[in-house]
Amino acid sequence: MREVWPTRLPLTVRLGISDFKEGSQTIEESIALIKRFKALGLDLIDVSLGFNIPDVSGVPWGPAFMAPYAARIRREAEIPTAAGWFIATPQQADAIVREEQGDIVMLAHAMLDDPNWPWHAAKALGVPNAKWTLPAQYAHWIRE
């Protein structure tokens, strides 16, 4: 892949690391695979669920529940990770990055719920000039 992939772009993979059921892919197997990917030039792994079986009863659903797994993969495979799954608050996203559980947070549900989530998060976290997370044509008119 690296032979044809532009060097100026990161090479990332979203990988379902486990189905959290006996007999399915294990996190240890995923870490071994990620190490192989890294040796071939992978820059970042987006840690996700497997969804290879219909039974999701073993999944530990909850706020930011994949972040600890992203942290483990980041540590053991020594590769940057993206953490996602039910990251809803600015504080959750900030903690994941600050505590080095992930290098990037994925915000699908949060962004669907609030397309201006980055601006609201920046304001909540006290970021100066938070309005500039919005497009310039909007930010210009907002008073903070």
Briefly describe each language-model feature range.
Residues R2-E144:
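Flavin-dependent oxidoreductase catalytic cores
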